[in-house]
């Protein structure tokens, strides 16, 4: 994991002109990969409401594998912008999750797969990573809690898989869209009663949504049409791990 922390440190300091780029020149000149293939696959096999046609996806498995190989050959460098890096890792996580499901399909839940988030299955450069490492050691450390609404764990209670690839130039609007959509989805969060019932994502990753000056309620109120009281007491809904597959 040493290279992950080195890369993140370089990324966080890349805006400082006084910092020297210590990456090898060949890596520093590497351009970000295109996400066009992934975008086309998503538009073809994911419905607007997030249902995934895994049977159809499997017909294009080779295209998905090729896309992941391209990402693996284009590991991020300190010269990439923050939005470029975020889009890269979100797309990588989601594409790798779809491939993981295809490799074990048919199944009823991602949790039917041994160590779905713990096994190192993802090649980036000369190292292998697990889905858990991509999420916890890279994406979460980049400090944007909205990634929790962008990465998809192939389950009904997860944020839906967006039917388009994330891209540097549209990332901000995409993250705002998925955050607002997830928070206001009554199947994932229930604000109908006196006591809000939230997705367990807000329980598991509560510290990602809070700062010294802002609470979880403050974060939620950014996206709710009717703000919650500052001292609202919340509870959490059960998490449905059933596969987010399209019903044929």
Label every model-predicted segment:
Residues 16-248:
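Interaction/scaffold regions that mediate signaling and macromolecular assembly across diverse proteins
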């Amino acid at each position: 994991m040493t290279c992950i922390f080195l890369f993140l440190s370089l990324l966080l300091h890349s805006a400082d002109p006084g910092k020297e780029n210590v990456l090898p020149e060949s890596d520093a000149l590497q351009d970000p990969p295109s996400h066009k293939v992934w975008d086309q696959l998503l538009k073809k096999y994911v419905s607007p409401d997030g249902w995934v046609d895994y049977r159809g996806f499997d017909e294009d498995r080779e295209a998905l594998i090729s896309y992941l190989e391209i990402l693996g050959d284009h590991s991020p460098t300190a010269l990439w912008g923050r939005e470029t890096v975020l889009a890269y890792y979100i797309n990588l996580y989601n594409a790798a999750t779809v491939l993981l499901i295809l490799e074990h399909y048919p199944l009823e839940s991602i949790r039917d797969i041994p160590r779905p988030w713990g096994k190192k299955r993802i090649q980036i450069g000369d190292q292998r990573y697990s889905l858990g490492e991509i999420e916890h050691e890279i994406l979460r450390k980049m400090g944007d809690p909205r990634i929790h609404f962008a990465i998809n764990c192939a389950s009904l209670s997860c944020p839906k898989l967006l039917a388009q690839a994330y891209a540097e130039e549209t990332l901000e609007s995409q993250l705002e869209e998925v955050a607002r959509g997830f928070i206001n989805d009554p199947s994932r969060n229930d604000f109908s009663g006196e006591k809000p019932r939230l997705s367990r994502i807000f329980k598991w990753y509560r510290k990602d949504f809070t700062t010294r000056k802002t609470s979880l309620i403050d974060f939620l109120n950014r996206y709710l049409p009717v703000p919650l009281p500052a001292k609202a007491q919340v509870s959490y809904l059960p998490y449905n791990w059933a596969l987010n597959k399209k019903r044929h």
